[in-house]
Amino acid sequence: MNNPNIYQLAVTGVQKLIPYKAGKPIEELERELGLTQIIKLASNENPLGPGKQAIAAIQKALPELALYPDGSGFHLKQALATKYALDASQITLGNGSNELLELVARAFLTPELEVVFSQHAFAVYPLVTQAVGATAVVVPAKEYGHDLAGMVQAVTAKTRLVFIANPNNPTGTLLAQAELEQFIGALPDNVICVLDEAYFEFVSQSAAINSIDWLKKFPNLIITRTFSKAYGLAGLRVGYSLSC
């Protein structure tokens, strides 16, 4: 074949991908629109920015930028393990929680398998599903949130992953502990529930769910979290997952 189109050499799922449209940087909007005072809400970035201790730690690390980082993230894993009373082996770090969603898809999906998630769910779920050639099964939303009964019914012998964001992104709906725990318990052992908790820090104390306790009960549960939102560190791209 002479002069092949390089895109035709990519796997089918990648060929059909529509790029994820992230919120535009303020500087880009200023150039496009000729404006100088823009308040950006598109990406749910923390308007307060990172904490003083985080800024101090970043400044302290600047002289080491010429060195490759610790690929295992030893110190961060140890800190998270201490915070959540887990073993460091239960923690996986990622380039934001987005990368962890991609890694889960690559690790567990093949073209003949299916992924279940809700309508109005995080836009990355269909992208990571399509990239590996798996089939997305989208369950109609219930009052802009998850129809858990409908999602259980959508599970078939081909289902390998279920994505749930709680609170949901972008609609903000919240599932209660009892109903979510019952849902995970209803899944077959060979169906992995990925619980995306990017916004869990914003839930009121009275409505908060201690999902980490479920790791002892559900070996098919993976929890993803991020430092991008509540901690104001979106620019550093630091996410992590918790599993059994």
What is each of the regions a protein language model found here?
Residues Q37, D87-I91, P111-E114, K158, ...:
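Short acidic capping loops at alpha-helix termini that bridge into adjacent secondary structure
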Residues L65-E114, V132:
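Phosphate-binding glycine-rich loop
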Residues H146-K158, P170-C193, E197-A230:
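Active-site pre-lysine segment of PLP-dependent enzymes
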Residues L80, V128-T129, L187:
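Short hydrophobic alpha-helical segments of the AMP-binding
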Residues S72, N220-C244:
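PLP-dependent aminotransferase class I/II
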Residues N2-L67:
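N-terminal "arm"/small-domain region of PLP-dependent enzymes with the aminotransferase-like
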Residues L41, V162, D196-A198, T224, ...:
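Structural scaffold positions in well-ordered secondary structure
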Residues A107-I164:
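PLP-dependent aminotransferase-like
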